[in-house]
Amino acid sequence: MMIEDDTGFVLHARAYRETSLLVEVLSAQHGRVGLLARGVSTAKGQVLRAALQPLQWIRFSAQQRGELAQLRGAEALDAAPRLVGQAMLAGFYLSELTLRLAPRQDPLPELYLAYGEARARLAVGAGLAWTLRRFERELLTALGLGFELDSASDGQPIDPAARYELDPQEGAQRLLSERGGERRAAATGSALLALAADEEPAAADLASLRLPMRRVLAHHLGPRGLKSWEMLEQLAPRR
């Protein structure tokens, strides 16, 4: 199958043999695509190599053969965001999460748009925590793994003053215990309603979403977590 003039975001690239790269791209028309880019380490291939850096938005053509597609050509469509510090780790997180959960060769236009929007927010220095929570919500929805955020699993409307655990399969479940550990790991009702309405909540409510959303994602990721979680963990108080 030929892939002609598709656009995509580079999620990951690593060296393969002496002059090639193995590249993972989230594309607009074909979903996640694995590419073999030959000759990028030669003098003539430097421009192509530069276009295949993580977070780069590209237009590309390839010949699909089995799991990997042979890259025929690619060009950068903009300047990749120059991210540093926390924003750089957040960009790594977006890409790693997409790489782990999005299946290959399954078009996911909503996820493509969500990734592009999150990338744009990182580029302009938008709030990291809200950018990540919005992307997590959109990713789960695009993969068919999302759930209602404005009503609990028992059908009752979310109470802004209550706290809720997020069950990966059932959705929001009202917390009945006020024990400190359980309370800290639960999202506020206000935060869930804000996430449902796509309106950034107050800082304390926003912070309450991190652990419940991670629990949901961890369920779908399986026993192997994310490398980016290990790095982001130390930044949690500031996110």
From Swiss-Prot:
GO terms for cellular component: bacterial nucleoid. Involved in DNA repair and RecF pathway recombination. It comes from Stenotrophomonas maltophilia (strain K279a). Keywords: DNA damage, DNA recombination, DNA repair. Belongs to the RecO family. It comes from the Bacteria. Gene3D superfamilies: Nucleic acid-binding proteins, Recombination protein O, C-terminal domain. This is DNA repair protein RecO. The keyword DNA repair applies.
